[in-house]
Structure formats: structure tokens, C-alpha cells
Swiss-Prot record:
Compartments in which it is found: Virion membrane; Host apical cell membrane
Carbohydrate attachment residues: 33, 67, 153, 174, 312, 341, 500, 526, 539
Further details from the record: Major glycoprotein, comprises over 80% of the envelope proteins present in virus particle.
Residue spans, topological domain Cytoplasmic: 568-578
Topology feature Extracellular, residues: 1-546
Matches recorded under Pfam families: Hemagglutinin
Disulphides: 12-492, 68-80, 102-151, 499-503
Cellular component aspect of the GO annotation: host cell plasma membrane; membrane; viral envelope; virion membrane
Keywords on record: Disulfide bond, Fusion of virus membrane with host endosomal membrane, Fusion of virus membrane with host membrane, Glycoprotein, Hemagglutinin, Host cell membrane, Host membrane, Host-virus interaction, Lipoprotein, Membrane, Palmitate, Transmembrane, Transmembrane helix, Viral attachment to host cell, Viral envelope protein, Viral penetration into host cytoplasm, Virion, Virus endocytosis by host, Virus entry into host cell
Membrane topology, record value: Single-pass type I membrane protein
Protein name: Hemagglutinin
Amino acid sequence: LMVVTSNADRICTGITSSNSPHVVKTATQGEVNVTGVIPLTTTPTKSHFANLKGTKTRGKLCPKCLNCTDLDVAFGRPKCMGTIPSAKASILHEVKPVTSGCFPIMHDRTKIRQLPNLLRGYENIRLSTHNVINAETAPGGPYIVGTSGSCPNVTNGNGFFATMAWAVPKNNNNKTATNPLTVEVPFICTEGEDQITVWGFHSDNEIQMVKLYGDSKPQKFTSSANGVTTHYVSQIGGFPKQAEDGGLPQSGRIVVDYMVQKSGKTGTITYQRGILLPQKVWCASGRSKVIKGSLPLIGEADCLHEKYGGLNKSKPYYTGEHAKAIGNCPIWVKTPLKLANGTKYRPPAKLLKERGFFGAIAGFLEGGWEGMIAGWHGYTSHGAHGVAVAADLKSTQEAINKITKNLNSLSELEVKNLQRLSGAMDELHNEILELDEKVDNLRADTISSQIELAVLLSNEGIINSEDEHLLALERKLKKMLGPSAVDIGNGCFETKHKCNQTCLDRIAAGTFNAGEFSLPTFDSLNITAASLNDDGLDNHTILLYYSTAASSLAVTLMIAIFIVYMVSRDNVSCSICL
């Protein structure tokens, strides 16, 4: 009895399928459905401003100076003297700083409103302990240092700003018109610091000008430092009486300006009557990032954004309104971005069938395989046991590593773009510290376009790498199966043994041993020999009987065939008689 058996199963490499496809954009394929995505963008909502995490954040210049504007602090108003804490970040909460108390100031004649913003741009700010000029003995003197009841000191006596000395001629002998006089302003700060020198001039109606200075004509003033020269001419009269912060009404006005002296550099001031000579100066160093915002600062945040307030960074990019931001901030992009985090979407696989020798089923994979929950790439087998699926964790991890690398590359691109294209935003200008919005928007558009292209290329690479992963799986599978299977193409192999779920799991884990699953091969014949009973006959006798019977049968058959042949040719006749 001979029994022929076939034990062929089919094993194929495959990719997972999903019932929830997502869409990503690629550079050349347009929109592609994938099994998973990593959202790269968020749209923030407006919140209160906060302290920047990991840094000291400055709100008011002098938090302990009560009832004082930042301009009061910058001028050194007597009741607004205090320490300005160091800070790496500052909130420009007075977009247009309000007027200072004390004496009425003509803010619009100079850039003095920018002084608080300039000071915010420094990390460390201190007021000098010594005066930069001896006002009493300055050219054109001797002078007395004027004070005003409109600017009371801490004891409520008459006072004036700590940064300026109101130089009033001491006696009638020098209360006369004078030609322009020049005083040198030395650098008294520490090396490496910037020196911010505040100065100004006073003007009033003709009567007061003659009374104070002996000259009723407009006076000329010039300041020069670091190659920047500024000219002013005073305005005589025409001012209505005005009181500041509850002070006494004043018919006169003061004009205040400042100059920035770099380390070791001197400045000059040329003046006539009514000069407000510089006294204590601001010594500043380091850089503090400045952003427009509002007070109070509540809690902490990763990022401070002019439009959204305090933000905690959850994604590398954001959509919505673009504006200046400081800290660990997401980068603005025009449209939402997603990075492929899986494989190209394939509908569940169909097994196409065709009849083969002995009714064997041949099929191949079309689409993706369901059930591969532990990974993206893996193996399938189908045969009498049905369909088994197993994920290859190593291949999946390699794919995940590539996506992680792409994500890290995008993060590096984010940092490089910030440093290269937005670096100028960190170096605040020495004066107004304002940005040209058109240039800033153009910079943001450029960064957004670069990031979007990088994401498209990353998605393209992730999707195209699937072929590499499948080819690697096919090589791995072929090596493990060895001679126990035949390569039939398309990543499929026909085995000479059964391969159920256990077999497939071992293949996926890399522990497969063909010997454990192999059965006799298809080309082996199973022959069952007939058993002979022993009747006391020896082998020779049995062989003799067998040979005689076989020979007699053969001779009889030959004679019968010969007779039939002769009769058919009429060479032999046969008569039957009864």
C-alpha cells in the first residue's frame, strides 16, 4: 500500500492594515493615507502672561517702587528710587510709556519714551553711586542745582530727578547769555557695561527765562556719543500751566533725552542756558529678551507670545496668529503639519486563489494584513489552519527609529532656523527695540515654507522606506526557512511543512527551527509491505511455485493471443460439433 502526502503551507511577508487611515502630505505623491500620524502643530488659545520657565522675568522695572511708572524709575524720580532686579526676559507692559510725575515733560520732542524699553533690554541694570559731572563747577557756572516743589523727595521737600542736575546760574554775574559751551561726559561704569546717560534742558516763558538765566532767546543744545549727534533748540513760552502727579502747576517744560556710551567711550554735550546736566547714570550689561505683554505675571510658561500670552510647548509648531515670542516656543507655520507614524494605508488583504496540482491552493498577498497589532511589518501564513499573522518587532522598531530620526531632524531644523533667520530678534536694538513687522512676517513665511517642505520630504522618505523594510524581511525569512521552503516570488515561500501560528510567531521572534516543524518531504513514497505467513515452506520452494505459476500463466496468455490472431486472419478455422 503506497500513500502520498503534501504538507505545503505558504508564508509571506506583509504590512499591517488599519480601519482608521490618516492623511499626510508628501513631496511627490501629494496626499497619502497612512495608518498613523504624529501631529506636529497646535493652535494655541489666549492666556495670561507668565514668568518664563528657567529664567527671571521682569515686569515693572522696579517692582518695589509703588505708584511709580517705569519712566519715573528711569529718570530717578525721588520717590521712585529702588533696585531693578536682573532678568533674562522682560515684559514691555507699557507699549507707550506714560508720562513721568514731577515736572511737565515734552515727551514728543525726543525719543525719551523709549528709555524704559531700552533698559528692559539689559539683563543687569544699576544706577551709579557717583555723579558723572560736577554740575556746580561745569562750564558757564558756578551753578546751583535747582529743585522743584512739583518733584518732592522722600521727606516731601523740594527735589529733582537723580539722573539730572538743573543747572541754574548761581548769581547775577553769570545770569547772562552765553555762547555754546561743551562739557565732556566720561565713562564711569565698569568695563563691559553700557552707560546710559540721561540729560535735558529747561525752557519757560520770556519772563521766567530772564529771571532764571538772564536770556530770553531760544537756546541750542547738542549731544554726541558713539558717532550719533542730536541737535535741539528750545521753545520759549506758549505753555499752559500744567501739574504732574498732583504737583504744583508749572508754566515751564523740560525736554529729556539720553545717549548710550559704549564701554570706555566718552560723550559730549554742548549747551547754553537751561541745561539739565547728567548726574547718576545707568550701567547696564547682558541681554534680556523683551516682548510686549501685560501684567500681572501669573505662574510659569515655556514661552511668552505677544498674541497668546503664556504658552506651554506641546508641539514643535503652531498655527494661528504670528507674532514675536520668546522662550522655548513652537515655530509658526501656515498650515497644520503631520508626520507619518506608520505605513502607507492598505485595505485588508485578499487571498487570491487558483487551482494547482493535487488541488493545492496557491495565493498571494494583496493589501495589508489585519491582526498585526504588535507591529507594522511581519509575516503571514495560510494553509489548512487558516491564516496566521505575526509582527516582526525588529523591523517595526527600525521603522519607528527612522521616524524618530526624522522628527529629531525637524527639531534640529527648527532650532537652526531660529538661530539663523530669527537670531536678530534675540539681539534687541539699542534704542526702540522694535521690529519691522513686514520683515518679521517675511522671515516667518520663509521659515514656515522651509519647515513644510522638510515635513513633506520626511513623509516621502518614511513611506518609501516600506519597500526596504519588506525586502529585509524577505531576506530574513528566506534565511530562516532554508531548504524547508521554496521561494515563489512576491515575498512568499511555499514550505514543505505546516506553519501554524506557533511556527509563525517563532519566525517573527527569530527563533524558528525548521527541524521542529518538518515532516517527510513531498517526493518520499510511503510503501507498506505485505506480510507472509510461514507454512513450513522454505524460500526456494516458494520461489519455485511462484516461478512455475508465473511462467504457465505467461505461456497460456501467449497461446491464447496467437490463436485469436490466426482466427482473425482466416488462417485457422474452428468447428464446434455437438
